[in-house]
């Protein structure tokens, strides 16, 4: 998947641009038939551009359907929609496990057996910048694992 499941976001963006394109063409046709002056048309186009720009924080994405991967600043809790991705290549990370009274259950895969809380589970944080995904694992050495998000590799330091 390359850092998470982005298809719903991509589809939402394509629909967003399709709706605005239809609205824009509809406005041009409306302006043509109403014989609106160019000055009025330019003001309304500027207003439409401002509205599109203001709607971007609501979409939580930059204004480009070509940029599919959002940067993820360093965090100890990956987004829920990306948890399976991060836990596949860093399966010993603490954010993949839910521990209660010393017994831990995997958050992603229900068929994983319960384990006792021990050194198998490491404190991890993650980050993603462009197509570079990183794990920061404590107290393992080496404690940083770099990989291409589109061609991920498992962290070798987890093999006991």
Curated annotation (Swiss-Prot):
InterPro entries assigned to the protein according to its UniProt record, in alphabetical order = ASFV_fam_110
List, alphabetically, the GO terms of the cellular component aspect: host cell membrane; membrane
- Major localisation: host cell
Q: Please provide the record's keywords in A-Z order.
A: Host membrane, Membrane, Transmembrane, Transmembrane helix
Membrane topology, from the record: Multi-pass membrane protein
Spell out the subcellular localization from the entry: Host membrane
The domain of life is: Viruses
Which stretches are transmembrane? 13-33, 35-55
- Which pairs of Cys residues are joined through disulfide bonds in the record? none
Hey, which family's this protein in?
Belongs to the asfivirus MGF 110 family.
Q: What does this protein do?
A: Plays a role in virus cell tropism, and may be required for efficient virus replication in macrophages.
Protein name from the UniProt record: Protein MGF 110-13L
Q: Which organism is it from?
A: African swine fever virus (isolate Warthog/Namibia/Wart80/1980) (ASFV)
């Amino acid at each position: 998947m390359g850092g998470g499941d982005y298809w719903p976001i991509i589809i939402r963006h394509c629909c967003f641009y399709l709706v605005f394109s239809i609205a824009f063409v509809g406005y041009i046709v409306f302006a043509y038939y109403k014989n609106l002056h160019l000055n009025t048309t330019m003001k309304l186009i500027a207003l439409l551009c401002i509205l599109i720009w203001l709607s971007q924080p609501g979409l939580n994405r930059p204004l480009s359907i070509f940029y599919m991967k959002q940067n993820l600043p360093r965090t100890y809790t990956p987004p829920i929609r990306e948890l399976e991705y991060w836990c596949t290549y860093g399966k010993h990370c603490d954010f993949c496990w839910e521990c209660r009274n010393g017994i831990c259950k995997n958050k992603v895969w229900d068929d994983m057996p319960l384990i006792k809380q021990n050194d198998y589970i490491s404190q991890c944080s993650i980050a993603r910048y462009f197509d570079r995904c990183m794990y920061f694992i404590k107290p393992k050495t080496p404690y940083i694992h770099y990989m291409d998000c589109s061609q991920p590799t498992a962290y070798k330091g987890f093999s006991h």
